[in-house]
Amino acid sequence: MAQNVTLYNLLISCPGDIKKEVTLIEAAVDEFNELYTETLGITIKTRHWSKSSYAQSGGKPQALLNEQFVNKCDAAVAIFWTRFGTPTDEYGSGTEEEIEIMLQSGKQVFMYFSDKPIPPSKINGDGYEKIQAFRDKYKDKGIYFTYSSDEEFKKMFFAHLSMHFLTEKRVSETAK
């Protein structure tokens, strides 16, 4: 039977060292959709450069990604671990630019910093310093969390995702 569903686009924004967390985000979103799509009529679609972009010319890479899908997202989840990312014309990394676009648009950003152990071969001093400076920039704004394990991240993210989108659903219903 056909059903009306409100679709939210969730941007996954992270440097290339974040791989396991992308899988965990996808799993958390799948779990959310399984629980709430039929009962509440809301669903979330994840958007990530690896699956939501296409080859395009005629502009700067990050600007093209922003136009293709970033600007169309309703919320974002951003994660940092050992790398800050590739600089853009405007920001220290594409991830930083995506976060700023979302925040300037008044959209929800779930921001996380990994405190998982780092193998010595993955340590990038310059990248780590940039991450710490970025983290310090937001420390008084209360918009990020840290985690020390994959399981902790998945539980925390699922809880935050659920609280936000269930609140969105309640607010939209009371506005009717």
Language model features with spans:
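Conserved catalytic or regulatory cores that recognize and/or transform ribose-phosphate-containing ligands
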Residues: 1-176
